[in-house]
C-alpha cells in the first residue's frame, strides 16, 4: 500500500535549483517524503556498502566502512567490515541464537562468539547498533514526524535543488529542527535508555553522551531523571537518489556542528537473497 500524505570523501555537483517559490513548494516536498517512505518500505531485501564518520565524546571523528546484506522483516543481517577490524563478520537473525549476534572478530584466537547485540565491542567507536542498520529508521522517523506534526512537518523541510552526487542525480533536502534542545525525562519503572531512544526516535549515541555511566540496556528506576534531546538532530541534510528515492548520503548535525555522516554505495535493491546467505555455514563466510 502506498504511503499517502494529505494533498497528495565524493564530489557533489550542483545541477539546478528552481525559484525560491517552487523550491519550497509543499506539494513537491510531500511527494519526495512519500516516495522515500514507499521505496524504503517496499524493499525488504537489500545490499550496500556504507562509509560512516561519527563524532565521539572527545570531539574526534571515528570512521568505518562495511558491506551488508539484509532482510528487514524478519530482521536478518550479515556484515563484513573493511574498516576498522578488516575482515570481521557479523550475523544476526531476529529470534535465533538467543537473539545474540554471531561475531567473527578475525583476530586471535580466531573463534566466533555469540554476544549481546548491545555489546559495545560491536560499535567499534560508532554510534549505532546492528538492529538499526539500513534505512528503516529513516522511514520510521518520517512517519513519526508526519503523525506528530502533520503538515507542519513540511515547514521544517527545505528543498535545495537537484545535485549530482557520486554520479547520481539526487534531491537535496535540509530538515531544520529549530527547537532542538536538551530536556529532562523521568523514566518509567524498568524501561531502558535503548527503549526510550527507539520509542522517541532520538540519537542513541547522543543520549549516551548526555548520561555518562548509564548502560544503554540497564533497567532504569521509576522516575529516575535522565537527559534526552527532543529531536534526533538539529539539522539533517539528505541526498535522495532520484532513481529509487533512497537517502544515500546523510549529514547529521547537532548544536556544535557535524555529528554523523553516512555514505551508501553499491546499493542493490532487486537481487533476491537466499536463506542460506543468512547461515553461518554459507560458503563465503568465515564463522
Predicted regions and their residues:
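Bacterial N-terminal signal peptides that target proteins for export
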Residues: 1-10
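Bacterial N-terminal signal peptides
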Residues: 10-19
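Non-transmembrane domains of secretory- and envelope-associated proteins
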Residues: 24-27, 55, 85, 97, ...
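N-terminal mature ectodomain segment of secretory-pathway/periplasmic proteins
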Residues: 28-112, 157
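Short, hydrophobic/aromatic-rich segments at coil-to-beta transitions
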Residues: 44-49, 73-78, 166-174, 244-250
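Short beta-strand segments
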Residues: 62-66, 88-90, 183, 236, ...
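The alpha-helix within a helix-turn-helix
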Residues: 197
Amino acid at each position: 500500500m502506498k504511503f499517502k500524505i494529505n494533498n497528495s570523501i565524493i564530489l557533489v555537483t550542483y545541477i539546478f535549483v528552481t525559484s525560491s517559490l517552487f523550491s519550497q513548494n509543499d506539494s513537491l516536498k510531500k511527494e519526495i517524503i512519500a516516495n522515500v517512505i514507499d521505496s524504503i518500505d517496499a524493499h525488504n531485501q537489500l545490499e550496500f556498502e556504507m562509509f560512516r564518520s561519527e563524532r565521539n565524546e572527545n570531539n574526534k571523528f571515528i570512521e568505518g566502512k562495511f558491506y551488508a546484506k539484509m532482510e528487514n522483516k524478519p530482521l536478518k543481517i550479515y556484515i563484513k567490515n573493511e574498516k576498522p577490524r578488516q575482515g570481521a563478520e557479523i550475523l544476526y537473525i531476529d529470534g535465533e541464537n538467543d537473539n545474540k549476534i554471531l561475531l567473527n572478530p578475525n583476530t586471535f584466537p580466531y573463534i566466533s562468539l555469540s554476544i549481546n547485540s548491545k555489546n559495545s565491542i560491536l560499535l567499534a567507536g560508532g554510534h549505532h547498533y546492528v538492529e538499526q542498520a539500513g534505512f528503516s529508521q529513516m522511514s520510521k522517523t518520517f512517519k513519526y514526524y508526519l503523525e506528530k506534526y502533520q503538515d507542519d512537518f513540511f515547514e521544517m523541510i527545505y528543498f535545495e535543488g537537484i545535485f549530482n552526487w557520486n554520479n547520481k542525480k539526487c534531491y537535496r533536502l535540509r530538515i531544520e529542527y529549530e527547537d532542538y534542545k536538551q530536556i529532562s525525562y523521568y523514566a518509567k519503572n524498568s524501561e531502558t535508555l535503548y527503549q526510550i531512544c527507539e520509542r522517541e526516535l532520538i540519537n542513541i549515541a547522543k543520549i549516551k553522551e548526555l548520561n555518562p555511566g548509564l548502560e544503554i540496556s540497564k533497567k532504569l528506576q521509576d522516575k529516575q531523571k535522565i537527559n534526552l534531546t527532543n529531536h534526533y538532530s538539529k539539522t539533517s541534510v539528505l541526498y535522495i537518489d532520484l532513481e529509487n528515492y533512497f537517502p544515500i548520503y546523510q549529514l547529521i548535525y547537532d548544536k556544535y556542528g557535524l555529528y554523523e555522516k553516512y555514505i551508501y554505495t553499491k546499493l542493490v535493491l532487486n537481487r533476491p537473497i537466499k536463506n542460506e546467505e543468512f547461515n553461518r555455514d554459507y560458503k563465503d563466510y568465515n564463522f
